[in-house]
């Protein structure tokens, strides 16, 4: 029937779109956004360059879509981790550790998505990612304050500072080499973040015991 043919075509188009984005993500993880070129993405995805252009008229369109999908993946991971926690402070800790673990697992990709210099027209997508991260952390901070688990503070400002702390501590030029000591880095950064928010005894409370390590994290 015609509608079945239409459904099959739609599935093929969606699968090709996903393959192109997956190829771009792999390349960005290997060489950064500068390495994401139409020709290299087409070759990795097993399609012609013209096919990529049919989906994405310009390279900036491809990278903007890639940034949006990376942001969706990371925000989704934070929400799932926080949603499985028993309380607001545990949820905040879980969100911090999840972001840190995933960033360490794909450090080159994280740098490409958040901090690597890009064309001016891509700044909006990158800023949206940072704002989404800050909003997620802000929601967890607000919930913890409301239940008396954190001292009163400006949740928006605290979330912005937390986002900056994590980015600089994990993928910025001053970030330490985490090779071979990923668990230590994730726990140390989480403890630092929680202390900055007013939790001096986070380790004693067991807030960093269930650290999910980069090798254990799987993309959704």
What are these regions (language model features)?
Residues 97-104, 112-117, 192-198:
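Helix-loop "lid/cap" segments that line or gate small-molecule binding pockets
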Residues 19, 27-61, 65:
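Helix-turn-helix
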Residues 72-76, 105, 121-147, 156-171, ...:
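Amphipathic alpha-helical packing segments from all-alpha helical-bundle domains
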Residues 1-4, 135, 139-146, 175-220:
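C-terminal peripheral helix-coil segments that are non-catalytic and often amphipathic
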Residues 13-25, 41, 66-70, 74, ...:
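Generic hydrophobic, amphipathic alpha-helix propensity
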Residues 103-121, 138-139, 205-211:
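Amphipathic alpha-helical segments used for helix-helix packing
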Residues 81-85, 110-117, 169-177:
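Secondary-structure edge/capping motif, primarily at the C-terminal ends of alpha-helices
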Residues 65, 76-108, 159-162, 186, ...:
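Hydrophobic alpha-helical connector segments
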